[in-house]
């Protein structure tokens, strides 16, 4: 029996199998995925795979080339900034002290990045 990790009514296609096992082991009881973005550039703008996930409780990320996952619980003052320049999109997670994380992707993923941003903002506001 397969259990969906996505919230009911989530428009995103299902999470790629290559990430599913890693995400399942990190979700707390009752925590579901609201949106996700498979990124395709590392910090040097070289092609590499990573994943950013907005859940009902937090933002999870596995940066390209990183050996570990990072996690940030939703809290006041946390923001996800979006911008693009010259074919490269950037999402930056920031708080009052500064940048916490940054992820880059080719603009072919921009629509999905905007969905992730919207899900993040909705969860942060709830």
Specify the residue positions occupied by each region the protein language model found.
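Phosphoinositide-binding peripheral membrane targeting modules
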Residues: 39-88
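Short polybasic amphipathic segments
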Residues: 89-95
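Canonical phosphoinositide-binding patch of PH/PH-like domains
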Residues: 95-116
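Short, charged, intrinsically disordered terminal tails
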Residues: 5-9, 118, 122-126
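Anionic N-terminal interaction surfaces
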Residues: 1-51
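Short hydrophobic/aromatic-rich beta-strand segments that constitute the beta-sheet cores
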Residues: 59-63, 93, 102
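Generic detector of well-ordered alpha-helical segments enriched in charged/polar residues
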Residues: 20-24, 114-121
């Amino acid at each position: 029996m397969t259990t969906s990790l996505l919230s009911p009514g989530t428009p995103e296609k299902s999470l790629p199998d290559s990430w599913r096992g890693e995400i399942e082991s990190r979700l707390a009881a009752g925590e579901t995925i609201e949106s996700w973005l498979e990124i395709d550039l590392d910090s040097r703008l070289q092609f590499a795979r990573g994943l950013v996930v907005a859940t009902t409780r937090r933002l999870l990320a596995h940066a390209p080339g990183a050996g570990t996952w990072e996690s940030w619980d939703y809290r006041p003052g946390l923001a996800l900034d979006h911008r693009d320049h010259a074919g490269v999109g950037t999402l930056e997670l920031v708080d009052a002290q500064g940048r916490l994380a940054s992820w880059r992707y080719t603009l072919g993923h921009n629509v999905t990045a905007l969905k992730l941003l919207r899900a993040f903002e909705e969860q942060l506001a709830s």
